[in-house]
Amino acid sequence: QATPIKPDTSKNLHIDNIDKKLSNVLHDLFNSSKLTESAKVKIASAFFSPAGFIKISEPLTKISKVQILLGTEPNSNKGQWDKKLEENEAAFIKRQLQESIENQDKYIKKERDYFPFDQASSSSVKTMLTALKTGNIEVRRYEKNFLHAKAYLFKEDEHPENSVIIGSSNLTANGLSANLELNVSNHDPEVIKETEQWFDRLWDESVPFNLASYFEEIFTPRDPFVIFLKVLWELYGEEVLEEYIQDKKLPLTDFQKHGVERALRL
């Protein structure tokens, strides 16, 4: 039997992705689990990306209970948040939240669409989908307010490395390994207990989030003609776009404009 990996969290550590990468610390921490029924992981993150999740997904699929709580953040476009004359404060915040939720959905889809299409990446996504569908990984989104917190909690009965890591890193590839971040791990049982209570309270107020549905589309069979058009666009898209910009100076009928726009959306 292989010797369990001892995670580098034996004391309170600063994790900044320079000397230590959070993805490596979390990977080793989750891999150190004895895989008992008491093992649990709870993650809160304002942002999410598939590339970030896959960095730590392999050990997560083995843990009996994993909860991921996603939040939303206000759009950086300040002009978008101008309060309308007819809005009271509650309506204004509600609109902000709704638009941020929609922006997050678009962001996840964009990250998915730009995810590398190779054998290793496809295998990782399939592993993630299996975990999401079998039920040991559950995802919810907090939609009552903007959730900006980032926390990674691991807990298991009689495990020497129970800990919570709190800081600035989102559950994204950059947050876990590339950006200059600052996170601190803490092993104080009271801190872990209070953080878990905080998490559970928000979890109970959150709504289920079908993360699997975003990635199932990757493996949906595609029309060969659409794939052919995609290949053409990758090869000649820039030239076509330049010609399109030039042609926009010429008058087009409505149906011609509609046809061009549809072609670009493909």
Segments from the language model and where they lie:
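Phosphate-binding P-loop
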Residues: 262-266
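PLD/PLD-like phosphodiesterase catalytic module centered on the HKD motif
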Residues: 1-261
